[in-house]
Amino acid sequence: MSNKLTAIVLAAALSTGSAAAGTFDFNPDFSVAVDAGSTGIGFEIESRLNEMFQVRAGFDWMPHFEFPMRFNIEVGDDGDPGYDSEGRSRFDRMAGYLEDMTGFKIDQQVDMIGEPHFHNFKLLIDVFPFKNKHWYFTTGFYAGPSVIGRAYNRTEDMTTLMCVAMYNNIYDKVYDIEYNDESELNGVFLGLELPPAVNERILAAGRMGMHVGDFKDGTRYMMEPDENNMVKAEMKVNAFKPYLGAGYNGLIDKKNDRLHFAFDGGVMFWGGSPRVYTHDGTEITSLKNLNGQVDKYVNISNKFKVFPVLNLSISYRLFNR
């Protein structure tokens, strides 16, 4: 679709400007520019080749900022807190066992930090089809990393996540003793032997994890720490992103023909709505019943099947044509 629109823009420009004498004479100038807007902040090198065409190359990057996410650690995959007669949840009981065995205290909440990772090289061609040579159409592309955002747990929650991984390892060892014949070698158990009553309680409780959302079949997705005891996610789009837009270029000061401003508006075609993956490869955007904050962020990102570009730039012409 973007290729067809590009062809239409160029054809219209050529047909409109072909009658103007000297329109296509090659007589370039060079300018440098700074810009800011929805693509971040950046710089450009510009060359007005003739009355009709201008070429721009540059780099934009999004300044650092953070947005929070919070998850509750649960035990088991049925969504039931499992309160006992004393009002303690399943998590409270298992966290107590873990503290008794290891001395580590586990918090039920894990905070994650989301931050942009959006930077792109750009190559753009402006076409000035009108007589006043201020309004223009633009085609070109942006290119950068496919990962445009990352999320990871706060450093303060590393101990909690280490405890979650430790508990799940204990669960696996207990499970092996009860149900996995391969855990026995020459009559010796390779798992972890605890008092039978403790084994029963751990197995009845289930594994620890953070409920992020549900798969389409209704199964709950429980995110667990990776091998480094961290939880992470990445937001991805296409690395190559065609661009179509329009803009206006004018003088800042009529007495100084070297200093210009420009407004650009258009769309970056980045391959549909961004996709979000956790460290274990699960695509969050395909889940339903997402956690509150995650649901809000995913709903927002799903609306952006293309990325809107709205930028302001100021340029200085190094030498005139």
Language-model features, listed with the residues they occupy:
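Cleavable N-terminal export/targeting peptides
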Residues: 1-26, 319-321
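Transmembrane beta-barrel domains of outer membrane proteins
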Residues: 35, 44-46, 126-128, 247-249, ...
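Transmembrane beta-strands of outer-membrane beta-barrel pores
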Residues: 36-40, 59-65, 141-147, 250, ...
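Outer-membrane beta-barrel "beta-signal"
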Residues: 305-321
